[in-house]
Each structure stands twice: as structure tokens, then as C-alpha cells.
Amino acid sequence: MATAAMTKVFVLLFLVAACYLPAHAAAAECDCATDTAGRDKAQALRLKVIAIFCILAGSTVGAALPSLGGRFPAIQPETDVFLSVKAFAGGVILATGLVHILPAAFEALSSPCLVGGPWKRFPFAGMVAMVSAIGTLIVDTVATGYFHRTDAKRKAAAVADEPADDLEASDEHSHGHAHGMSVMSVAPAGEEDLVRHRVISQVLELGVVVHSLIIGMSLGASDFPSTVRPLVPALTFHQFFEGIGLGGCIVQAKFRVRSVVTMALFFSLTTPAGIVVGIGISSVYDANSPTALVVQGLLEAAAAGILVYMALVDILAEDFMKTKVQRRGRLQLAMNVALLLGAGLMSMIAIWA
């Protein structure tokens, strides 16, 4: 049910961005002049087609690596290697929010093409990012609390219906259960972690998909080869690293295979689909139109708030504060190095992307 609800949210966001932006971009006028020097639609289109396949491959491999890596004991969840990889992914997601997305939101909402209105009189990008982070916290805690309350009621009803003579044997037997794929079939401690990971993975995917859609449409709408060419490798690595971060969270959530494939496909296809939409609207799309700037800025700011919260609270803090990590200096050092490496590499990509 949760995956189906997330699917509807993703589809709705895609339709809003794909239909609302181009419909208003052509109608709006702006004093900002558009430079036509270097425009070559044919060459740009060839580069966009290459970008679709490169980004699709990079996204798919990145999202699939954590799941496929589960076949190898060294990189299964809670191992030292997995924790280091997850720290690297947390750095990638944090840099995505703070270095890639949030500055773009401020730039869009402070553009000289936004004449009139409240956009230049108040830092809306920062406020929207803050509200988005707080909203993510609320969704995170409310969803987790709901699952816990529902499970507590189910257990209370099961205990009430069970004969008194069987309670002791049932209690002893329950401690021998192994962790399963279902939330209802795991031991209490593991169940709490599993619920948290499932909420984390779905909220994180929401923020990643919003950002992926926007960058895909921006690339697809450009007719300048000089702009598109460096974005092809930059966005391929960008999506690859993001895929590793998202894939690691999905692995820990222990979804069924169908749900894992669905979430991975949504992530992998969003940017290529955004490029296709951008190609379709390139003749009417004006990136400097007030409506396009406002919609892009608000969506980018909201996505930044989600990703920054998820990276700091649900990915990095959760693992760095574990007793296992605190007691082992080498593991702590490895995770810190991985964190800095992930954040540094993703920040470097901002030079081209």
C-alpha cells in the first residue's frame, strides 16, 4: 500500500512539472535577453539521446549495486564495508542538497527576470527548504508512530485471543524467530529498525525524484551543445552516486522484490523521462520566464530540505551514533573518510553540473 501511494505521488509530481512549466513559460515575457550564439538543435539532440542512455545506465547500476552486493557477505547490511559505503552515500546526498539544489533554488528565486512580486523581498528558498525539512521530520515520526501503534494493537489482540497455557511457550518460541521480509514477522528490536528504514527509503526517494525530474527537464530543454556536453558525464556520475545512496536505504528496508524493482525503476527512469519532456518542450520553454523560475525554485528548495534532513538525521547520524561504530576507532575513521570523500566528489561535480 505504501509503495502504491508513493507511486501516485511521483506520477503527480511528474505531471505537474511537465504540464505546468511549459504551458506558462512561453506566454511569459522577460527583459532578460536570450543569447542565441552557439545554438545547434541537431547536435544538441544527439547529445541528449546519448545522455538518456548514459544517465539511465548510471542510475540503474548505482541503484542496483547495494541490492546485488547483498549476495556478498562483506557488503551485506551492518558490515564495516556497508557502513562505510552508506557514509559515502550520505555525503553524496548531503552535497546534492546543499551544493547542487539549494543554490539553484536561491538563484532561480532571486533572478533579475522576476520583476515584481515578493520573491526578492524575502528568502523564500531558505524558508521553503526549512519547512520541507520540518515537514519531513513530521512525516518521518508520524508514519513510524502509526506503524508502531498498529503493530501494538495487533499484538495486544493476538495475546488476548491466545489461551493462557500457551503464553509461556509462545513467548519462548518468539525469541527464536529470524528476521523476515515482512514488518510483522520480525522480532521487536528488528521490527523497529525495519519500520524506520522503510519510511526513510520512501521519503528519500521522493526528494531524489523531484530533483532528478528537474535536472532532466533542464538538460532536455537546452539547445546549446556547449551546455549539454559537459552535463552528460557529470549527471551520469551524479545519478550513479545518488543511486548508491538510495539503493543502500532500500536494501535496509527489506522490501519485497517487486517493491525494490519499482522504486529502483522510478529513480532510474525519472531523469531520462525528464530529458524526453524537455526535448518536447524545448521550442516553447523559456527558462527565464517568471513562472518557470518560481516553480523550479520552489521545487528545488523543497527537495533540498528533504535531502539535507534525510542525509544528516536518517542516514549519517543514525549510523555514526551506533555503539558498534563508537567503540571502534578504525571503523569510525573509515566512515568519516568515506563521508568526506562522498561529499567532496559530489561537490566537484557541481563545477560542470
Swiss-Prot record:
Compartments, record wording: Cell membrane
Residues in the Extracellular compartment per record: 28-48, 108-121, 220-230, 282-292
Record-level GO BP terms: zinc ion transmembrane transport; zinc ion transport
Keywords: Cell membrane, Ion transport, Membrane, Signal, Transmembrane, Transmembrane helix, Transport, Zinc, Zinc transport
Keyword Lipoprotein annotated: no
Induction: By zinc deficiency in roots and shoots.
Disruption phenotype: No visible phenotype, but increased tolerance to an excess of zinc.
Gene Ontology terms, MF aspect: zinc ion transmembrane transporter activity
Parts of the chain on the Cytoplasmic side: 70-86, 143-198, 252-260, 314-332
Signal peptide: 1-27
Topology of this chain in the membrane: Multi-pass membrane protein
Alphabetical list of InterPro entries matching this protein: ZIP (IPR003689), Zn/Fe_permease_fun/pln (IPR004698)
Protein origin, superkingdom: Eukaryota
Spans traversing the lipid bilayer: 49-69, 87-107, 122-142, 199-219, 231-251, 261-281, 293-313, 333-353
Presence of keyword Magnesium: no
GO CC annotation, single: plasma membrane
Function comment: Zinc transporter that mediates zinc uptake from the rhizosphere and may be responsible for the translocation of zinc within the plant.
Similarity remark: Belongs to the ZIP transporter (TC 2.A.5) family.
Other observations noted: Plants overexpressing ZIP5 show decreased zinc concentration in shoots, increased concentration in roots, and are sensitive to an excess of zinc.
Protein's UniProt name: Zinc transporter 5
